[in-house]
Regions:
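Formylglycine-dependent sulfatase
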Residues: 1-211
Length: 211
């Protein structure tokens, strides 16, 4: 807040532009193969299934492989059919985080012995609130402080298990000692289904709870 107590709007950059240099472009210069898997959401839709213009797609921004990267902030469905222009449907009922992990491991296998970088940006946690039935049952009676919607907990555990599969694959391939794994988030907790207290506010705000 400024001294007059009036909040000022933050500048909004609606999409990547040509002058923006991505880490994928820099890593390509260094000889790395790169893959983007999951939520792109930095360019407007220009076609069916969330498709974006090539120049502002993951491929246009330096990534060699794009799996599921579209204009979507949240997927039409976390279960196949996905209705995603950059992701072929899997078997009916396939869960999106599991599919993205399979694609990630396939990319790692395809680049064995080479330097590589994978950006695995799960759509989790986002609307629609969907998780595998066994996890929904597990969390069905676990409402309480910080968990206002039990589906939220189920989705987080599903993502946690998916990440564990990537780490296990790296260990099995003996790449776990020379691979840098960064786990981070793009925003705070989701208001309505979670509770960020004692931090103020939640996703969509510039207070601590939102970042």
């Amino acid at each position: 807040f400024p001294k007059d107590g009036r909040p000022q709007p933050a500048e909004l950059v609606p999409q990547l532009n040509g002058e923006h240099i991505t880490i994928a472009e820099r890593m390509k210069e260094a000889g790395y193969a790169s893959a983007f898997l999951g939520k792109w959401h930095v360019a407007p839709s220009s076609g069916k299934g969330g498709k974006v213009d090539d120049a502002v797609s993951p491929n246009g921004q330096g990534f060699d492989l794009n799996v599921g990267g579209t204009s979507y902030g949240g997927p039409p469905s976390f279960f196949s059919p996905y209705r995603n222009a950059e992701l072929e449907d899997g078997p009916k009922g396939e869960y999106l985080p599991d599919r993205l992990v399979e694609e990630t491991i396939d990319f790692i296998d395809a680049n064995k012995g080479k330097p590589w970088m994978a950006h695995l940006w799960f759509y989790t946690v986002h609307w629609p609130m969907q998780a595998p039935e066994p996890l929904l049952r597990k969390y069905a009676d676990r409402k309480g402080p910080g968990l206002n919607d039990t589906r939220y907990g189920a989705m987080i555990e599903a993502m946690d298990l998916a990440i564990g599969r990537v780490l296990s694959a790296l260990e099995k391939k003996k790449n776990d000692k020379d691979t840098l794994v960064i786990f981070t988030s793009d925003n705070g907790g989701f208001a309505g289904v979670s509770d960020c207290r004692p931090l103020r506010e939640s996703k969509g705000h510039l207070y601590e709870g939102g970042i």
